[in-house]
Amino acid sequence: MAKADFYETLGVAKSADEKELKSAFRKLAMKFHPDKNPDDKDAERKFKEINEAYEMLKDPQKRAAYDRYGHAAFEHGGMGGGGGGFAGGGFSDIFEDIFGEMMGGGAARQRSSGGRERGADLRYNMEITLEESFSGKTAQIRVPTSITCDVCTGSGAKPGTQPKNCGTCQGTGRVRAAQGFFSIERTCPTCHGRGQIIPDPCPKCHGQGRVTEERSLSVNIPAGIEDGTRIRLQ
């Protein structure tokens, strides 16, 4: 079976520059990625073709050889072949973007490295009188707040016990899965990106290391505020 033209595979013209190639690859990789198309052999095959086409066309030397000789330039090991995986520098940035969008921005990776997690956004709807909107006021509101558990001091483990390194990911929070001739890094399914497992969870926070409590906040409502106005607190 004849191989598809690399330019046609990516849906770009032969005059496409590096930026156009990268944009086309990223769009198609997102569409046909195995994680978005589980058990779909056609999508997996298409993803491999997209990967191979970009691997060749992003390299100026390989692209020049392909433009001159077509697929024959890579037969019998010429120019290093077409299955070299992610040796080029362009893939790391692109796949980091792709996995970021697919996996919610890499929060699990941040947890496994010990970084502080960003709290969830909260929205509070407040009703005030017409008089208050003219004169302004200071209002007290109560909002749920995530704080460190005072029983386990944030470890998530029952007092007197300790978390253990995850045996699946060896404490990294990430695992690699083979997909044909390339591999994909994913959040560890055992520890969910933490890098640790908790055999004996804390009875108060149930292994989360944090608990939710309400706290009071003062909100200054400025004079002349209009209906639908948003006030942001950080």
UniProtKB/Swiss-Prot annotation:
Cofactor: Zn(2+)
The record's free-text note on cofactor binding: Binds 2 Zn(2+) ions per monomer.
Biological process, per Gene Ontology: chaperone cofactor-dependent protein refolding; DNA replication; protein refolding
ZnF (CR-type) ranges: 136-214
Family: Belongs to the DnaJ family.
Assembly description: Homodimer.
Function per UniProt: Participates actively in the response to hyperosmotic and heat shock by preventing the aggregation of stress-denatured proteins and by disaggregating proteins, also in an autonomous, DnaK-independent fashion. Unfolded proteins bind initially to DnaJ; upon interaction with the DnaJ-bound protein, DnaK hydrolyzes its bound ATP, resulting in the formation of a stable complex. GrpE releases ADP from DnaK; ATP binding to DnaK triggers the release of the substrate protein, thus completing the reaction cycle.
Record's protein name: Chaperone protein DnaJ
Species assigned in the record: Rhizobium leguminosarum
Record gene name: dnaJ
